[in-house]
Amino acid sequence: MQEKKEEDLQQALNKVSEVGIDEVGKGAIFGPVFAAAVVLTEKNKFILKQFGVTDSKKLTPKKRKLLLPKILLLSSDYGIGQSSAREIDKLGIRVATELSMIRALRKLKEKPSELIIDGPLLLRPWNGIQKNIVSGDSKFISIASASIVAKVSRDNLMERLEKNYSGYLIFKNKGYGTREHLSLIKKNGITELHRKSFLKKSKLI
C-alpha cells in the first residue's frame, strides 16, 4: 500500500508542470530584449532549487553558465524569444518586451494554459491564465530558471557581437548604459544596434 502511494505521488510530481517566463535586457541601450519560458515539473523544480537556481541577478556569470545546461536538461520544454533594437524603437520597450515573451512561448511544443510571469507585464494577446508575480524570479523556480536562460542567452549574444562592435566594450557592459559605454558612443557614434529611443533620453541624439 505504501509503495502504491509513493508511486502515485511520483507520477503526480512528474505530471504537474509550471510555466515560468521572464525577460532580460529591458533597460539596456544596445541590442535586443530577450525572454525565456521554462516548463518544469514539481520534482525538477525541487532538484533545480537544490542546485542553487534563483534570480539570475543574484548569481555570478560563472554560476549562471554552470546552471544553464542543468535547467535545459531538467525542463520539460523551454523557449527563447527576442525583440530587436529596431522593434524596441518602433513599438516601445513595453510592447517589444511582450513580443519577445510571446515569441518565447510560441517555441514551446504545447501552448500552456497557465503562465506565471515575473513583474506586472500582462501579455496581449494571450488566451489563458496569467499570474503576475512581483520579484517572481526570487519566489518561483520556473521564473528563476527562465531568468537564467534569458540572461545567459543574451550575454552570449553580446559577447559574439563584440567582434563587430569592438569600440563599445559590449562584452563588458552587455549593452547597458554604463558611463564608459555612453562615453564611447560620444566618441565612436551610434550603431544600428543601439536603441535610439533610449539614447534620446540620454540626450546623445
From Swiss-Prot:
RNase H type-2 domain ranges (all copies): 16-205
Enzyme Commission number(s)? 3.1.26.4
GO terms (molecular function) for this protein are: manganese ion binding; RNA binding; RNA-DNA hybrid ribonuclease activity
What EC class is this?
hydrolase
**CDD domains, per this entry?**
RNase_HII_bacteria_HII_like
Q: One of this protein's Pfam families, by short name?
A: RNase_HII
Give me the disulphide-bonded residues.
none
Record's keyword terms, sorted: Cytoplasm, Endonuclease, Hydrolase, Manganese, Metal-binding, Nuclease
Q: Name one GO cellular component term.
A: ribonuclease H2 complex
Q: What is the first-listed, main subcellular location in coarse terms?
A: cytoplasm
Q: Which residues bind a divalent metal cation?
A: 22-23, 118
Alphabetical list of InterPro entries matching this protein: RNase_HII (IPR022898), RNase_HII/HIII (IPR001352), RNase_HII/HIII_dom (IPR024567), RNaseH-like_sf (IPR012337), RNaseH_sf (IPR036397)
What are the coiled-coil residue ranges?
A: none
Summarizing the function annotation, the protein's role is:
Endonuclease that specifically degrades the RNA of RNA-DNA hybrids.
The record's HAMAP family line, in alphabetical order, gives:
RNase_HII_B
State the name under which the record lists this protein. Answer: Ribonuclease HII
Recorded source organism is Prochlorococcus marinus (strain AS9601)
